[in-house]
């Protein structure tokens, strides 16, 4: 177990919480600049830890809200930054709507690698409450979110996030600026939910995407034939693999499909990212 010291406070990094503390001052300031937040915005930080990003946010605004699951770190933040409205709890469970007031949330965070997928889908499910999300995460996941068709990174996560959000890869962060030092690099991305949903049936689309990419080497026809009536889809399209279609192309395909009532059970868990 690695103990991290910061301002005479010793806290053991908890592996089960995926804790890797950012102790660099310049990177948090860059994250804040890239987020575009300004005084008066409704800011929510996910997992402030020792407050590296929190301190940078406070350089822009006098107060904001943060959610911290670790009781030791929550106590540290309360003592170190009493101006922060700290909620001690699990971001995956804390109701977000009461935090919005009359506006939308600008979310920032250095999110744990171990729960990146659940956090992303929680944000996606609550995108009507979100103005933007500027997040640091595992570099590989950031690449997959921002991937383009025809690449090995392009898959379920890219399509599901890009369908409902404008996504942008901002910059890479080396592993040496964290303690404990992770085995992989990180990256910062920005998500901005789209004003209009591209599809009426969001849940149906997510299920379709999982099925389309379930076995990447198979054609769309082979992956979808058990679940949908494809009579309205051109044969040329069904001969392709899912990775060949753009997000817009996959949305267009989904709109032409009719579910088969006796379709087999879904092959993937809802929040799986391949």
UniProtKB/Swiss-Prot annotation:
Record's subcellular location: Cytoplasm
Domain of life assignment: Bacteria
EC number: 2.1.1.182
GO molecular function, one term: RNA binding
Keywords: Cytoplasm, Methyltransferase, RNA-binding, rRNA processing, S-adenosyl-L-methionine, Transferase
Chain sites annotated for binding S-adenosyl-L-methionine: 20, 22, 47, 68, 90, 110
GO CC terms: cytosol
Signal peptide: none
Enzyme class: transferase
One Pfam family this sequence matches: RrnaAD
Keyword Endoplasmic reticulum: no
Main location: cytoplasm
InterPro entries named among the record's database cross-references: KsgA/Erm (IPR001737), rRNA_Ade_diMease-like_C (IPR023165), rRNA_Ade_Mease_Trfase_CS (IPR020596), rRNA_Ade_methylase_Trfase_N (IPR020598), rRNA_adenine_dimethylase (IPR011530), SAM-dependent_MTases_sf (IPR029063)
Reaction catalysed by this enzyme: adenosine(1518)/adenosine(1519) in 16S rRNA + 4 S-adenosyl-L-methionine = N(6)-dimethyladenosine(1518)/N(6)-dimethyladenosine(1519) in 16S rRNA + 4 S-adenosyl-L-homocysteine + 4 H(+)
Family under the similarity heading: Belongs to the class I-like SAM-binding methyltransferase superfamily. rRNA adenine N(6)-methyltransferase family. RsmA subfamily.
Chain's role: Specifically dimethylates two adjacent adenosines (A1518 and A1519) in the loop of a conserved hairpin near the 3'-end of 16S rRNA in the 30S particle. May play a critical role in biogenesis of 30S subunits.
Official protein name in the record: Ribosomal RNA small subunit methyltransferase A
Native source species: Chlorobaculum parvum (strain DSM 263 / NCIMB 8327)
Designated gene of the protein: rsmA
């Amino acid at each position: 177990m690695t103990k991290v010291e910061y301002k005479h406070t010793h806290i053991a990094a908890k592996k089960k919480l995926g804790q890797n503390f950012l102790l660099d001052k310049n990177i948090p300031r860059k994250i804040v600049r890239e987020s575009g937040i300004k005084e008066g915005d409704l800011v929510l930080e996910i997992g402030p830890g020792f407050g590296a990003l929190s301190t940078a946010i406070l350089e822009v605004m006098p107060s904001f809200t943060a959610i911290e699951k670790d009781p030791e770190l929550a106590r540290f933040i309360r003592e170190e930054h009493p101006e922060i409205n700290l909620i001690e709890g699990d971001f995956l469970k804390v109701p977000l709507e009461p935090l919005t007031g009359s506006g939308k949330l600008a979310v920032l965070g250095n999110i744990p690698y171990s729960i990146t997928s659940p956090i992303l889908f929680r944000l996606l499910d609550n995108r009507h409450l979100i103005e933007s999300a500027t997040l640091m995460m595992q570099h590989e996941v950031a690449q997959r979110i921002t991937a383009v068709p025809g690449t090995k990174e392009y898959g379920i996560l890219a399509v599901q996030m890009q369908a409902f959000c404008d996504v942008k890869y901002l910059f890479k962060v080396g592993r040496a600026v964290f303690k404990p030092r992770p085995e992989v690099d990180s990256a910062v991305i920005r998500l901005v939910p789209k004003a209009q949903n591209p599809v009426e049936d969001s849940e149906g689309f997510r299920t379709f995407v999982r099925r389309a990419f379930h076995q990447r080497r198979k054609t769309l026809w082979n992956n979808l034939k058990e679940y949908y009536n494809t009579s309205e889809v051109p044969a040329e399209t069904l001969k392709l693999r899912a990775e060949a279609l753009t997000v817009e192309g996959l949305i267009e395909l989904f709109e032409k499909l009719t579910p088969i009532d006796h379709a087999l059970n879904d092959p993937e868990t809802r929040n799986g990212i391949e």
